[in-house]
Amino acid sequence: DQDKVFKFFKKIKPELVNIAAARVGGIQANSNFKQKFIYENLQIQNNLIHGSFLAKVKNLIFLGSSCIYPKLCKQPMKESYLLSGKLEETNDAYAIAKIAGIMMCYNYSLNYKLNYQSLMPPNLFGPGDNYNLKNSHFFPALLKKIYLAKVKRKKTLDVWGTGKPKRELMF
């Protein structure tokens, strides 16, 4: 609700807004609920970025995602590779929303002389993470699969993908 966001920002007068909020999930969730991922992420971003502008917030940090880069992106990834190829189909709706947030920050900064920056964090994991095998991110799901294989004394492990993508991880 953009009006509530604006009223909240007007009341507390933040010097900096840090946007880490997003609907997130793994391959299965991103594939099955694309409409939710694009709609909810655009709503979150639009409300927070524009609400910050209306409340005269000068500094904003927007967290992007490595999924904004092309599916066949050269490794290691560089900022210049953004929009240089086709996105991964399984999470293109989420990626498009994140790209829109990046462009909003860029253009608010350009047009209004604000310090609205976009940062691309690595894949984060840790306490309180989602370890559900059906809708978690890659690394928490992998950790859970390894744990379950160990507990059940399995000799093999089912891991999706080719194994070629490189990932940065941070605990």
Residue ranges and their predicted role:
Residues 1-130:
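N-terminal Rossmann-like NAD(P)+-binding domain of SDR-like oxidoreductases, especially those catalyzing
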Residues 10-11, 23, 153-155, 167:
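Arginine residue identity/basic-tract feature
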Residues 31, 151-152:
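Short leucine-rich amphipathic alpha-helices used at interfaces
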Residues 93-96, 104, 117-118, 130-145, ...:
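Substrate-positioning beta->alpha
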Residues 113-114, 152-154:
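Short helix-terminating capping/connector loops at secondary-structure junctions
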